[in-house]
């Protein structure tokens, strides 16, 4: 039998010893006081009992400061930024498919600048969130991030966005991503695979991804995507490059309707297409999907749209 000291501060089955002592002592003095003692003990110990539960920290209306914990260089202009949450057990509380806003005051700008990013981490990982960001010459927030030092903070607000993925919302999903447009796709892909029957879920959604980039070095997270495709026969990825290397077996040039027809599911009521990338690419993909029989994408995407643009 496990032994304990009445003066110990360790928890027993979620209740701290002083509370247990209060109940025991009350029961000895007068049994009818016992319910009140139990209630009081619950109040006294509540802070400890609930302190280890996961807490969602995002606020949709107010910016909060999060400290840069790590910075991993991916390429000459791409890095993964890891920001710490207030407590190790905290999670962002970001629905799958949604994104967050980052804000900063940039030198030379009269107003605070805001940009939206989708974390590549999920609420499965507590205590931090990761952002994959490419620094552009004219990108105010991306350049600001690139200049952040470990220990400095970034203002974050969210969640936001019309897309909220739920298991089996459609039978098939086709994805078209360009550059850092891969981030919301990866978030959804990983959620689907986590929810497979073999992992204790019921998600049987089939996913096909076309991922377009300029050069081989621009293919972000390729190793992770390849590993996911290897492990899950319900996920397939097809790479497209403007400047392919010798012996390249993927697509070449821009994403065309013929590529979409060959690599993504055909238009059907139980099929959805997700698009994310540079504005010119998104515009071209809207036209391409419409030409293949998908419903015309709206100016502002809604969750129920057959073609959804992030």
Curated annotation (Swiss-Prot):
Gene Ontology terms: cellular component: endoplasmic reticulum; mitochondrial outer membrane
Membrane-protein topology? Single-pass membrane protein
Involved pathway(s): Protein modification; peptidyl-diphthamide biosynthesis
Keyword hit for Transmembrane: yes
Transport listed as a keyword: no
Q: Which residues cross the membrane?
A: 32-52
Q: Name one Pfam family in it.
A: NAD_binding_1
What InterPro entries does the database record attribute to this sequence? Answer: CBR-like, Cbr1-like_FAD-bd_dom, FAD-bd_FR_type, Flavoprot_Pyr_Nucl_cyt_Rdtase, FNR_nucleotide-bd, OxRdtase_FAD/NAD-bd, Riboflavin_synthase-like_b-brl
Q: Which residues form the FAD-binding FR-type domain?
A: 61-166
- Which Gene3D superfamilies has this protein been placed in? Nucleotide-binding domain of ferredoxin-NADP reductase (FNR) module, Translation factors
Cofactors that this protein relies on = FAD
Q: How does it assemble?
A: Monomer. Component of the 2-(3-amino-3-carboxypropyl)histidine synthase complex composed of DPH1, DPH2, DPH3 and a NADH-dependent reductase, predominantly CBR1.
Q: Which PANTHER family match?
A: NADH-CYTOCHROME B5 REDUCTASE (PTHR19370), NADH-CYTOCHROME B5 REDUCTASE-LIKE (PTHR19370:SF184)
Protein name, as recorded: NADH-cytochrome b5 reductase 1
Task: State the organism named in the record.
Answer: Ajellomyces capsulatus (strain NAm1 / WU24) (Darling's disease fungus)
Q: Which gene encodes it?
A: CBR1
